[in-house]
Amino acid sequence: MSIEEQQSPITSTQQGLVLGRQKNGVLMFNGIPYAEPPVGDRRFKRPVSPASWDDIRDATRFGPAAPQLPSGGMTDSVPVSWNEDCLFLNVCTPAIDQKKRPVLVWIHGGAYRSGQGAVPWYNGASFALNGDIVVVSINYRLGALGFTDLSRFGDDYATSGINGICDQIKALEWVRDNISGFGGDPSKVTIAGESA
């Protein structure tokens, strides 16, 4: 990969091309949608795969985190907006090549009420650089949007009480289907997290 390609790396996902950035010796792709926005008719429903895009998608900035009550911690001060359209993930990789590195998917904690994948200690740069692995961090629906049981309103809401967990599963499916484009091996995925 040339210096120019390292500064503005582009790779492919099933939905289309994404543009990342180089920072501190690793390649970062942030704010990649792994599901359709859970808004409007999709609110309180199981996540579905995202639609494709034609242009190169800018993946140089983190996507919004799920709406949440301020927790008084560092997640309140990270410069990422909160929005119901929050089903984004971030990929940090040493290189885009055919090496097939192990993958670590980090799921943030916060008692299912707060948190986000954009906090600095979740970005994975140190692991990617020093451990030669690909690191993925995710956002998922929190609080009432992710864990309110509305199943009594019909089959469309059958998963409403566990949609935050369904979001995590959808993110793992995205990793399985797309991580090879980021130098990762979909058969070597480790899931980790804390709290929640």
Regions from the PLM with identified roles:
Residues 141-144, 192-196:
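Short, solvent-exposed turn/loop segments enriched in Gly/Ser/Thr/Pro and often Arg
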Residues 109, 163-167, 195-196:
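Active-site loop->helix "elbow" adjoining a glycine-rich segment at hydrolase catalytic centers
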Residues 1-162:
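Non-catalytic accessory segments of hydrolases
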Residues 86, 158-181:
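Alpha/beta-hydrolase active-site loop
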Residues 102, 175, 182-194:
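Alpha/beta-hydrolase fold nucleophile elbow
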Residues 127, 180-183:
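A general structural signal for stabilizing positions within well-ordered secondary structure
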Residues 91, 96, 173, 184-186:
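A ubiquitous, low-specificity "background" feature that marks scattered single residues
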